[in-house]
Amino acid sequence: MAKILGIDLGTTNSCMAVMEGGDAVVLPNAEGSRTTPSVVGFSKKGEKLVGQVAKRQAISNPENTVYSIKRHMGEANYKVTLNGKTYTPQEISAMILQKLKTEAEAYLGETIKQAVITVPAYFNDAQRQATKDAGSIAGLEVLRIINEPTAASLAYGLDKGDVDQKILVYDLGGGTFDVSILELGGGVFEVKSTSGDTHLGGDDFDQRVIDHLLAEFKKTEGIDLSKDKAILQRLKDAAEKAKIELSGVTVTNINLPFLTVGPDGEPKHMDIDLTRAQFQKMTEDLLEKTLVSMRRALSDSKLTPNDLDKVILVGGATRMPAVVELVENFTGKKPYKNINPDEAVAIGAAIQAGVLGGEVKDVLLLDVTPLTLGIETLGGIATPLIQRNTTIPTKKSQIFSTAADNQPSVEIHVLQGERGIASENKTLGRFTLDGIPPAPRGIPQIEVAFDIDANGILHVNAKDLGTGKEQSISIQKPGGLSDAEIERMVKDAELHAEEDKKRKEEVETRNNAEALINAAEKTIKEAGDVATEDQKSKVNAAIEDLKKALEGKDTEEVKAKTEALQEAVYPISTAMYQKAQQEAQQASGEAGSADARGPDETVVDADYEVVDDEKRK
């Protein structure tokens, strides 16, 4: 059976895993790393770069590099411009997914068409739909969208058998934060509540360090660096490195030589010490936000910290000592550390993929919707149909009516959020139901049904009970894409894949040609009298032809001249090999004869003459 890929599509890093022999296995990327930076860029030559190679060139090419695109998933009007072309967040995310898919296929030696992709528990409908669209553009059928904390609990609890446990999952990633309360038992993973912030993560901690460095440099040198993209990229890398180092040491040095040039033309360097205490002070309000979400999640699940059996930390940012201390102080429990926080979510996604593919038995995942769903009613009131933390999939319906006599149609305004006033919530869509027969206000009965599927994506259905007429309403989600747009983007992605393949082939052809030239020149030098002058001149001519072809851009010409050089070198290489073989055999034979004679026997060299063809005649 074909493998289903489990993907943690992260803000700063992504990870992939599959089920192998009943276990979830994290797959390395082409560079050998188990995580891939969620960075996309284009080189100055127009080559698409994804992952570590994109991150490496960001300092010298910041305007053609994009980070943390996940923060903009579901934003209808957000676009990025790379290499003169605009892209949606879905397309950028698809490039990351495409890299993971391609490299998983290369590692496994088989085609992958299906995936389970994780999202923050607090992602709304538009963000989930955008993630699914990104998978489609990358050529993946997304079988399921699951919440990241839930995936982490699967990674933790798969081997825990029938032990009943209540778990708090604290997930602080690069750009998002979630906390979920789950109950495990008998193979059932039931989410009781979830809370979080889709715009809070490790990036925000990095930004505090960047702001500090900018302020310190301005204070000491009187220069504002905040407008220079290349310098900001260097500061971003330095801030991230400092944050990571401060998890293991109490002070770190940020040293960036030749950062800029002063008014007098003298180079300016940055050399600033940052202590862990300073770092914790400048980020304490960010940690306080996570505490608010933990309190809310526990309150919604009707549990107290004392009721918890385990606390799991997920996401690279949870390595910060202040995070560990905060969670431990709040829950009264030491966090469970037997799971790699960078890999737990991908492992959980692979387990869910195994459930869907039939490889994993006796596991049932019951997730919840993170936000209340409802519609706007008379007076701008938000009337809920599905409350937050309702187990999904679920379907709820309610009867509504007209607000005026003989009203021929009603507009239904679909909302997501916790506020009592419609305008304070997020609009998921609007639709109008026409053809209502004339009647006094309050008489027509319009049934509106909300249906949330297992991916947490909303579908709405409306029915006029008076006429029996039923309509399925398709909400145009903010940030969602039409089938035609997805199809166009799929073709664009395929086109890029072909371009990448062609460019790779061109590079390999040129590399092979240059290697052959070096080998041929070495062969000529070492050939001696094994090669005739005619053979040598043919090889030298073929070398010059190939060098000339390499100066141009015609790959086919390079291939042809490479083959010609191979043909010219072949007879010489063959002759050299045969000579070496004969010499080895001769040496072996002489050694054998000497051994047979013993030490006292005289060795007599025989005179011989090489008879050429002319003398034979």
UniProtKB/Swiss-Prot annotation:
Keywords carried by this UniProt record: ATP-binding, Chaperone, Nucleotide-binding
Q: Which family does it belong to?
A: Belongs to the heat shock protein 70 family.
MF GO annotations: ATP binding; ATP hydrolysis activity; ATP-dependent protein folding chaperone; heat shock protein binding; protein folding chaperone; unfolded protein binding
Q: Which GO terms describe its biological process?
A: chaperone cofactor-dependent protein refolding; protein refolding
Q: Per the record, where are the segments of Acidic residues compositional bias? A: 602-617
Q: Which species? A: Methanosarcina acetivorans (strain ATCC 35395 / DSM 2834 / JCM 12185 / C2A)
Instruction: Explain the purpose of this protein.
Output: Acts as a chaperone.
Q: What is this protein called?
A: Chaperone protein DnaK
Q: Where is the composition biased (Low complexity)?
A: 580-594
For this protein, the record's CDD domains field holds:
ASKHA_NBD_HSP70_DnaK-like (cd10234)
Task: Give me the ranges of the annotated region Disordered.
Answer: 579-617
